[in-house]
């Protein structure tokens, strides 16, 4: 994991611990300060490939550390 990937992962992890729900890409970019949303998305996608972050495509606020478990959002509809 690169230093920037680690920084994004820690931002996601801290967001979960502090607020109890997923950050948006915009939230992560804002916390990072100097990063755009496109760069944030690429890093989050890479973290998903590495298996340290999970998300559901097409559904908002589903970026979460791999250690977080919650009900499948489709079951709740």
What are these model-predicted stretches?
Residues 7-14:
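Pre-recognition alpha-helix immediately N-terminal to the DNA-recognition helix
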Residues 22-34:
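A short alpha-helical element within helix-turn-helix/winged-helix DNA-binding domains
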Residues 44-45:
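Short, hydrophobic-biased segments on the C-terminal half of alpha helices
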Residues 48-58:
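A short, conserved structural fragment
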């Amino acid at each position: 994991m690169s230093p920037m990937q680690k920084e994004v992962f820690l931002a996601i992890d801290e967001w979960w611990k502090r607020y109890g729900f997923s950050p948006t890409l915009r939230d992560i970019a804002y916390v990072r300060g100097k990063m755009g949303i496109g760069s944030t998305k690429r890093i989050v996608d890479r973290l998903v490939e590495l298996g340290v972050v999970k998300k559901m495509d097409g559904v908002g606020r589903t970026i979460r550390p791999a250690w977080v478990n919650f009900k499948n959002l489709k079951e709740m509809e």
